[in-house]
From Swiss-Prot:
Main location: cytoplasm
Organism, scientific name: Nitrosococcus oceani (strain ATCC 19707 / BCRC 17464 / JCM 30415 / NCIMB 11848 / C-107)
Residues annotated as binding ATP: 608
Gene3D superfamilies: 1.10.730.20, HUPs, Valyl/Leucyl/Isoleucyl-tRNA synthetase, editing domain
Subunit structure: Monomer.
Coiled coil: none
Lineage: Bacteria, Pseudomonadati, Pseudomonadota, Gammaproteobacteria, Chromatiales
Protein known as: Isoleucine--tRNA ligase
Amino acid sequence: MAKYKETLNLPKTAFPMKANLAQREPQALKRWQAMDLYGKLRNAARGRPRFILHDGPPYANGAIHIGHAVNKILKDIIVKSKSLSGFDAPYVPGWDCHGLPIELNVEKKVGKPGRKIDVASFRRACRDYARKQVNAQREDFERLGVLGDWCHPYLTMDYQFEADVIRTLGKIIEKGHLHKGVKPVHWCVDCGSALAEAEVEYQEKTSPAIDVRFPVVEEVELLARCKAEIPGAGPMSVVIWTTTPWTLPANQAVALHPALKYVLVECSAGQGRERLLLAEGLYREVLARYSAESAVILATCQGDELEGLKLQHPFYERTVPIILGEHVNLEAGTGAVHTAPGHGQDDYVVGNRYQLSIDNPVGGNGCFLPETPLFAGEPVFKANDHIIQVLKERGNLLREQSLQHSYPHCWRHKTPIIFRATPQWFINMEREGLRTAALAEIKKTRWLPGWGQQRIEGMVENRPDWCISRQRAWGTPIPLFVHCQTGELHPDTPRLMEEVARRVEEKGIEAWFELEPKELLGNQAPAYEKVGDTLDVWFDSGVTHTCVLETREELGVPADLYLEGSDQHRGWFQSSLLTSVAIRGTAPYRMVLTHGFTVDAKGKKMSKSQGNVVAPQQVMGSLGADILRLWVAATDYRGEMNVSDEILKRIADSYRRMRNTARYLLANLNGFDPTIHGVPAKDMLALDRWALDRASLLQGEIVQAYEDYNFHLIYQRVHNFCAVDMGAIYLDIIKDRQYTTQADSRARRSAQTAMYHIAEALVRWLAPVLSFTADEIWQYLPGERGESVFLTTWYEDLPSLGEEAPWGRAFWDVILAAREAIAKVLEGVRVEGRIGSSLDAEVDLYVEESLYQALRKLGDELRFVLITSYARVYPAQKRPVEALETEMPGLWTVVIPSHYPKCVRCWHHREEVGSHEDHPELCSRCVENTEGGGEQRAFA
């Protein structure tokens, strides 16, 4: 064999079999940076139609986690695929740099502002901290292979950005959407600040659940309104149920549902006979809860018949009215709701209708104010026990028990929050029809998955006014002057805000905090108070449509796509929508796509304590970023995304299949120059045209899947193409032709041409996902080409077959189905030990008429398709009894271990081996290929 080895066209390439991604990717990244790949991509795309994916800013705090990696990789896949589709697809990354988490980390190092450090120095420390965090995160994002304008990202703490946020707030004020009010807001005692909806998370909490008597002051009037024929005996009370006893000091009313039925029940519930007003739909279970005895219904009435009746507060010397509210329901409690407008949104809304006092006896530290009777200075949650004790002493506690329920917590501190009425600045949801307009814009937007629309609609329909003010040091200021007497904004507010914005452009937010009012207001300064609040960070990020999309030349409004995690329906998607609609009346995006959260293999949330955290840095350092990218693409991101070391290892196995396919194509293109050696499609062998047709059809599916953001389908299709269409069929069949025919023969050049076209297409299919690997493949492809695969577009030189042409798809579908059926029979014979490989076999095929004609068309080349030494075709009626029925209807086969000698060059067993005097070890075909004019192939 040694003397014939040099006559074979064996595959050869410098493209490494071992990926060593963890070592090679950083080198590729340096190359991209040195060549300014993103800049070249921008230049190459100039003049194309634009596609704008707007980056929602991650928070500049801490190392990136697997969720960050998912988000950035998905965005990068989309941007790169859009570029390949012929779009100008810029990507400008950004960071959210203000807010509480940064403050808390800086506090740990330098202390609280105003105590251990002055506020200006504290803000400088926050800015320095955020900048370091941005740099660390940027390094990791780039390492993931994400292409973007990393040299010029947007930062919400940039002076220009801060100034533009102020200008945007000015526009919202001019449109009439801002108002100041005393409203109950989510308040974190540990933060010392109001919280946005998106900063609240719900956790299980155990609370005291108590039933409280509110004695009826006007008993006779209540009996009259209920048309009670028998007055009954004992004290009369309306009973409420609450899990927040600490809100009772602020009680201003008891709410009933106007349309619900209520019953007045006489019973014994531990204090002798008494009369209790309860909802008819709940009274049985309520009385059972009290272990009440001898219950008698005295009267029935509707809630709206009792409006305005006076009740006695359970421990203060004041009366409170019965009011009506649609928020009252029969899900739990008694059907009567304790109402404290200073401590709850529903209470606030109904209280406003009745002009109730918005009483807030709780300070920002979570303790009752000094003037609060009975409970002054007590922390509210600890005061629960004291309040319950007072209720017992007053005889107004009916029942006490513990209840585990879902309760709002601060997302940062993980501690229970309170509802607390404070003076705050709000974007009013009703003024100028903001809520209605926002809902209309939601309907005009495409949401993927579709349930996202219903989710955000429900949130916008039911959300309260947006509290945009915070009592923090590190944030964009709300630069307003309020009249000391009237509370009204300065009449020249728009001009003043623009002046402040100009100063902030030069000095940052410190320009406002250092500003003396007289610098802008002159003699009017003593009459006005300078607002010290800062903006909710969700306002900062929510106005990137004006501060980034509108201000950067390569971008524009609306963006084509916003893409974030599904938690952003109540976060960035919503804040962006509301601010954009408030300013320009339209949504800032055409489409919104959301991805699920990452969980471990068992669907559990990741946590260090569970030991199931997958850190992207570790994956990049071991398996490589491309494995992480392939996992993201392979997973249906619309639901939860399972990841673990084992899952990533399986992905790495799939990666090797695709890499090996690319390597095999490259190895067989050694010495091939497409401009010199390329064979026109019409002159190519039939099987090669079939392979190109498969690639052409697949490319259509892949481009469509990229268009539809179905990346997991791309992974499935490409992997299947590499494993089946290429590995199991085409490359397996042409191996003989590629290795044994003459180097410059049409048969070999035809196969090389097909492999060249397939490689050109494959490298582009892979590029958005396996970015490092695709660019590595690109460097080894023959022919002239640009510096990077990312500077090109989808490959367009893939010819396709017709369905019914003589050698069209229908023909090859039949042939390859027969091949698969025969291969299974051959495998059975091999397992039995009768043959070593399929080339040790001869097959006699007995077939029905339609299949007979198709197989006969291939003539002697059928054996190359089946990879057997002989393949003979006979009509089905001639089949012997030993013929085996295959899985293909109308096809039987007899497998015969060949007794002919084996050609040492092509390994086929042929009758004529040994008949050539000079080459006794070769078959006639190999003699022709080594000494003659070369064999001729037509089909395979």
